[in-house]
From Swiss-Prot:
Subunit structure: Heterodimer of HisH and HisF.
Class of this enzyme: lyase
Name of protein: Imidazole glycerol phosphate synthase subunit HisF
Originating species: Mycobacterium leprae (strain TN)
UniProt subcellular location: Cytoplasm
Similarity section: Belongs to the HisA/HisF family.
EC number: 4.3.2.10
């Protein structure tokens, strides 16, 4: 089995960054230190990660500048694609991140405020460089504004938008983004498994690749995410604290007939 776009499924460690250190909490709260960012990134590169995600978990809410120096240092030592997000507000922000060594840039809060920003970014740098990060949480069903039952949030999940998360993912794809980073704020950090229903809904709404994020806690969680429609699986604490390795996840997927690199 290949991903929805016919490619091998990617395994992506996510490095949530606070003040230059890798941290992981539950729902972006109660953050605890998980290690030096560049050191971890190099270890994941050697271990066989297909890509790395750097997410500044404070940038959007505190207005801090994006972590250019961290990206530069990491890009000098690792040779797999780097996706960077957090605090990206303008086309110029994307430009400096790509010049610093990022391969893809993830956008969330700024795009909610000005959706046409996605088209501007994709038009200037190419769809393959722009990822729409959708931090979605469950809301009561029956709402006319959020018919899918999931709402897009901003500022690390602290602010609701009233925008339907599935519809927002589809709009982002229409505006030219090359990928959707779909993060369940309900599942994030809980290790209870990915939100499979949300994955299926977004997979049915878009043709671009979808990265499943939020909830990975056991080896049994990854194969269902792929069968639900994920083209890539992203996890943080299970990798940082050595509860699982990249190799174990790839072996489990390969045993289930899923193509991995």
């Amino acid at each position: 089995m290949y991903s929805g776009n016919g490619l091998a499924v990617r395994v992506i460690p996510c490095l949530d960054v606070y003040c230059g250190r890798v941290v992981k909490g539950v729902n972006f709260k109660n953050l605890r230190d998980a290690g030096d960012l560049v050191e971890l990134a190099a270890a994941y590169d050697a271990e066989g990660a297909d890509e790395l995600a750097f997410l500044d978990v404070t940038a959007s809410s505190s207005g801090r500048a994006t972590m250019l120096e961290v990206v530069r240092c990491t890009a000098e030592q690792v040779f797999i694609p780097l996706m960077v997000g957090g605090g990206v507000r303008t086309v110029a922000d994307v430009d400096v991140l790509l010049r610093a060594g990022a391969d893809k840039v993830a956008v969330n809060t700024a795009a909610i405020a000005r959706p046409e920003l996605l088209a501007d970014m994709a038009g200037q740098f190419g769809s393959q460089c722009i990822v729409l990060s959708v931090d979605a949480r469950t809301v009561p069903t029956g709402s006319a504004r959020t018919p899918s039952g999931w709402e897009a949030t901003t500022h690390g999940g602290y602010r609701g938008t009233g925008i339907d998360a599935v519809e927002w993912a589809a709009r982002g794809a229409d505006l030219g983004v090359g990928e959707i980073l779909l993060n369940s704020m309900d599942a994030d950090g809980t290790k209870a498994g990915f939100d499979l229903a949300m994955l299926r809904a977004v997979r049915a709404a878009v043709t671009v690749p979808v990265i499943a994020s939020g909830g990975a806690g056991a080896i049994e969680h990854f194969v269902p995410a792929v069968t639900a429609g994920a083209d890539a699986v992203l996890a943080a604490s299970v990798f940082h604290f050595r509860e699982l390795t990249i190799g174990q996840v790839k072996d489990a997927m390969a045993a289930a007939g899923i193509a991995v690199r």
